[in-house]
Amino acid sequence: MQLIGLTGGIASGKSTIASRLAELGAAVVDADRIAREVVEPGTPALAEIRRAFGDGVIAPDGTLDRPELGAIVFGDPAALRILNGITHPAVLRESTARFEAAAVADPDAIVVYDVPLLVESANRYPFDLVVVAHADAATRARRLFELRGMDPVAAERRIGSQVSDAERLSAADLVIDTGGTLEETYRQVDALWAGLRG
């Protein structure tokens, strides 16, 4: 099994790269999806979040009120550290279980771990390769506004709450520039895949 770490800032094109790699045959483990699963009603992580941030972060149906929690943690580094201290260990445990399952199913699998906070979480996985999806901050802010309807001020705050591009790029073995067209991104991903299969 080869384990590839895929990371990048918010709206950097990680999901586009992960989807393309899945189409080509990679087993993709999505840390964001796992992060949603580990805070579902009844989970220990959701109970810890409630204790740390109060009942206001729980919606009437018992689910996590993500906008309310986001309003608390984005822009408050101490609150974000508390949240990450709750969620990251749960996500890492579940992710490890999925890597192991992929290796059992196919010892030659190429497993792509799509993990936005790879640098922030001081990830200790033995990646064979770390790939960074990169677009400049202005492009990412525009995508957040145009594609996700995020308020420009909120977009800037969200981008600013993450590690710097320089820190993220310093962790890269390979950078995929996602600032151009979709076809240009796909060409880079296809070349990566050919190298991994070679």
UniProtKB/Swiss-Prot annotation:
Pathway: Cofactor biosynthesis; coenzyme A biosynthesis; CoA from (R)-pantothenate: step 5/5. GO terms for biological process: coenzyme A biosynthetic process. ATP binds at residues 11-16. SUPFAM superfamilies: P-loop containing nucleoside triphosphate hydrolases. It is found in: Cytoplasm. Catalyzes the phosphorylation of the 3'-hydroxyl group of dephosphocoenzyme A to form coenzyme A. This is Dephospho-CoA kinase. It comes from Leifsonia xyli subsp. xyli (strain CTCB07). The lineage of its organism: Bacteria, Bacillati, Actinomycetota, Actinomycetes, Micrococcales. The gene is coaE.
